[in-house]
Amino acid sequence: MQIKARQFAREHSLFSCIQCGKCTGGCPVNLKTELNIRELMYHVLVAGKKFEVDDIEVLWDCTTCNTCTDRCPKEVNPMEVVIGLRSAVVEGGRAVPGTAKVALQSVFNQGNPLTFSSEDRAQWVGDLEVRLLSDEPGAEYLYYVGCTPCYDPRIQPISRALVRMFGQAGVDYGILGTEEGCCGSEVRRLGEEGLFEMLVEDNMEIWEERGVKKLVTTSPHCYNVFIKDYPQNGFEALHYTQLVAQLLEEGRLTFTGELAKTVTYHDPCYLGKHNQIFDAPRSILQRIPGLKFVEMDRSREKSLCCEGGGGRMWLEGTNIEERLAHQRIDEALGVGAEILATACPFCVLTLEDAVKIRGLEDKIQVADIMELLTQVT
């Protein structure tokens, strides 16, 4: 599959690239694979009229963490270059590799990448009393749960904790239940632009029907795609940490216990590097009675990617022996943390998997912030 190199370079501002190497120098995946985004952009620039994209296996190693874009002094977006090249591969009729193909097919057929039935999307609710917007539209907030929080047994407790907290704080909210569709974040980042556009159209249509003006998400990936890649037709999106921090500030949530643990925080890339939401999660943790908060050296803008973004939850990549999540666990242990907290379903899964693989369950626990809050409220 060939792309029109000059047109692609213009569309992605590649003629501004000065080949300084800051993108590759900061790329966490470059430490373990042959992905070199500076070199990749150079080859597009010097390709002449056509550039061959079929055989670039490392193209699928990128986690879209945004470090390269943050570091670029010329305001080029190398991450979008990767997504654009992936899109060219898909549009050219080539399938994405590995289990990502299954995930994309599942999104098309069932509205989620996890191969579960769309009819089971609201089973996470269990016996909780939750308002369905199909029955009672017009709530102040749509709680957009997301695919992984709806279906994954490890993540479902986070969704349930949020619902209980909404009730305690008197938040006027509702869910879409089986009407909720995939946000499309990873679909777009795997290069399936056509499917992504279909999801956007379907989601915005149901939001309009249900009177959605504000929505709050479990996942930073959903939050990011809603504010960056969806048409901004009068709706406001929040990540749950923003809303919870606000509720605590307003005194609408009260603590009934304490958590006498040493806790550090892992910044999810799509909350931190992509959207500069660093303070809200920390303010929540630092309010918990008894909790001792410690910071890792690689935090905030310098946070190490867990390797779950950009569709990598469904792609092993070219080097499965070395995992960034294992490094992150070492960093958390290095500052004496008993709990590694985060605020992203993908981060919870990758980091907890690293703990289990290394047999460190008796040394450190991985938890979402909501799982800690539910212990003390």
For the regions a language model picked out, list residue spans one by one.
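A broadly conserved sequence feature marking short terminus-proximal activation segments
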Residues: 17-41, 273-276
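Short, charged low-complexity linear segments at domain edges
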Residues: 1-9, 34-51, 279-288, 312-316, ...
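Catalytic cores of enzyme domains
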Residues: 238-243, 249, 253-275, 287
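Cofactor-cradling patches in redox/metallo enzymes
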Residues: 149-239, 270-287, 292-377
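Phosphate-coordination loops involved in phosphoryl transfer and adenosine-cofactor binding
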Residues: 138, 259-261, 337
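Iron-sulfur-cluster electron-transfer modules
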Residues: 5, 11-14, 31, 41-180, ...
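Residues immediately within or flanking Cys/His clusters that coordinate Zn2+
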Residues: 14-24, 59-69, 180, 266, ...
